[in-house]
Amino acid sequence: MQNQNGKASGLLPLFLFVCLFVGSGLITGDFYSLPIVAAALAASVVSLAMNRKEKLSQKTEWFAKGAGHPDIMIMVMIFILAGAFSSAAKAMGAVESTVNLALSFVPGQFMVAGLFIIAAFISVSVGTSTGTIAALAPIAAGISAEIGVPAAYSVAAVVGGAMFGDNLSFISDTTIAAVRTQKTKMSDKFKTNFLIVLPAAVATVILLMVFSAGGHPGAQAGTYSWVKVLPYLGVLIFALLGFNVMAVIFGGIVLAGVIGISDGSLTLHTYLTAITEGIGGMSELIILSLLIGGMAEMMKRNGGIAFLLQFVSRRIRSKKGAEAGIAGLVSAANLATANNTIAIITAGPLAKDLSDRYGIDNRKSASILDIFSCAVQGLIPYGAQMLSAAQIAKISPISILPYSFYPILIGVCGICAIIFRLPRFTEKA
């Protein structure tokens, strides 16, 4: 990648996409005024129209390769299952019962902070932020109405907790990619990474409790049924035990159907209809993921990604500058690809060269890659995490940004770790 000639023009599709999506929202005051899929489609067409030296058939194959990247396909499968589970669980009363159960035991001012902590534990266990969001976002949206806080606020807590696990889990794609590209041990990277982001997690919990104090801590809980809570309870328990997230969500779909049909709240027809409607509700998100994946591949082929990497690497003059450069490399790659795993794989080899050249500990370089990729991924409104959370909660992804405490704070902690050269290693890995 670093040997490819970089071209700033290769980033034109990304620039167009952001301008259309964000610009139209700022101008009209409504971020739904221009459907995000329309912006992505326009940018994708531009990416295919560029580089006239190549045949359209070849460029179409490249686009399809990007759209069909394993990371994209896994996300699509999770989105399909998440839509089906969310709709089926809601139809048989699981969401309402789960919200009322939570309100019965947890004071309102601690509820959102609790969502962050639960999301963090689940994400660490299953290694996927999107799966965690799929399981918890419906509950977060339901709780927000009961305790008097914006849905974007409670959903942002779930996204933040999910990014905590995405960054630290031993089975997360981002962790594996960072460890492999930097040639360090998983346990060593975890310890280093954890020390850097722990203050961000603690500060996030405190902020969530402070901001929740303005809600309605005395919200009255309605009636609930333990049986109806089982689909969500089962998903949470088996996710925490580390089972495959797709298998866990599929099990939740089946359990919701069995309970709903058994107690009469669903018939086979209404159950299957709910599943179909849930999957259909995710269609926009699925299409968007495919378009962004294809567009990212075209930007790579057109030299846009290489331009970003070269632009950052040329400005490095010191060890501290090299660490900042690694952070900049992976952040830029993440902005362009909207996928933190792909961003780490893209920037990883050059980051390894920089760490070797300037004597950066491999544990630190791996942590920087993972921290900044997760910080950016948790903030971009066109990333899978924000989009899926917004889709489930029926809100704009832009509305989640002001409450995205954790992604912002891990970025701040990462910058502090670079400036103050933390943590200080007593022995070489």
Predicted regions: what they are:
Residues M1-I80, T192-L288, E427-A429:
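Hydrophobic transmembrane alpha-helices of multi-pass small-molecule transporters
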Residues Q2, R52-K55, G68-I72, G148-A152, ...:
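Juxtamembrane helix-boundary/capping and inter-helix hinge elements in multi-pass membrane proteins
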Residues I27, F31, G160-M163, N167-T223, ...:
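Juxtamembrane and boundary regions of transmembrane helices in multi-pass small-molecule transporters
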Residues V37, A49, K59-G93, Q109, ...:
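Core transmembrane alpha-helical segments of multi-pass membrane transporters/permeases
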Residues H69-M75, N100-I118, S144-S154, L198, ...:
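Membrane-interfacial loop-to-helix junctions in multi-pass transporters
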Residues V76-F85, F105-I139, V312-L350, L369:
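Hydrophobic alpha-helical transmembrane segments of multi-pass integral membrane proteins
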Residues I78, Q109-I122, G148-G165, G321-N334, ...:
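Alpha-helical transmembrane segments of multi-pass membrane proteins
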Residues G131-G142, V159, F170-T184, F307-L308, ...:
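Re-entrant/interfacial helical elements at transmembrane boundaries that shape
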